[in-house]
Structure formats: C-alpha cells, structure tokens
Amino acid sequence: IYDHGGTKAMIDALASPHEVSGAAHLPAAVAGLSSVDYIASGGCAVTAIRVEGPEPSVAHRCEALRALLAPLGDTEELHSKNSQTLWREIRDVIYFSEDQERHIWRLSVPPKEGSRVALQILEGQPGEALYDWGGGLIWLALGAAPDACADVVRQCVAAVGGHAMLVRAPASVRERVSVFEPQVGPLGDITSRIKEGFDPNGVLNPGRMHEEH
C-alpha cells in the first residue's frame, strides 16, 4: 500500500465499529528496517491495524477488518510476540534511531492530511516518514540541512492546521531553528502572560514546550 492508500486503510479501520486500538503505516523503506522478518522481508509498505481483547472477539473483528480492507491490498495477521515487537518499534520510533545525522521532526496533523503533508515535505529533500495515530502523528527523518528544512516543514504543517516540533538535531541547528512551533501574535502573548502569572521569575522549565518571548 502506498502512503495515500495506507491513510485510507487507517481511517477506514478506525471509523469502523471493530474497536481498533492502534493504526500505523510504514512506507516500504521503513518497513524494511523492522526486526520482524515478516514485515521486513515483504519489500513493500505495511499498514498495521491493532485489535485487542478476548480471543473470540479479536478473531471476529480481525475477520471483519480483513474483509473491509481487502480492496486496498493483501492482508495478513500478526500474532503474539511479532505483534508486540512491531508495535514497540512503532512506539519507540526505533527505525530512525541508528542514523544520528538525520534530523527528526514530530508532526501533528489531521489524519486524512497526513500522507499529503509528508509527501509534500519529502518532494524537496531526502527522508523517510512513519505514520502513527491513524496518520495524525508523523515522524519525519530528514537529511542533514543547516536549518533542518524548518520553513518547508512548518509551512506544509501550518497549511492544514497542524504543528511541528524538532525532536533531534545538532546544537548548531537548534541555535538557529525554533524547536517548538513558534507562537506569534495574540496566542504568543496569551501563552507568555499565563506563564508569567504562575512563574514570574521564569524558574520552571525555562524554554520548555514553547520559545521564550
């Protein structure tokens, strides 16, 4: 499944009555990094849908989901240890941990816009994406750049009402690029006033979760 198809699969599964507890999409290059052989050896993108609960209920819901998603691609079930390993890898974003040269962004966007936003960003620079939360959370690993591609990332994310946070980059990049989504105008003023109200001396987590004004 390509990224757009993966987004549709996640949205359809989450919108179904089958109590899906997790939905993630691994493009082919990312899936190939998994330690789960069945995932890594396929040579294709993988959309993972998690179902939990009593065994009879899980079996019934899996069957229904496979029928629902069959038009989008082949479906297989992943059980016990392999399933746990895959979801742990996704949670920990383990696929992007090896190459320390790449810059890591965490994007929050409307799920239906996830693949479009990521592909727009990746059109102009090398990198990989990992989609979680049904496409609403995107982890981007981008090639090293002096500004971590911040303008492109934030423009694409802002266009759909999302926000972006730079999670990993060298100190030299962090010195010139805001780690958190810049808060300008009234929103920035409100944030500053609230913080000053309960922390007038600025001793509680300075610079955490937003840039100082």
Annotate each PLM feature.
Residues 72-213:
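Conserved glycine-rich FAD pyrophosphate-binding loop
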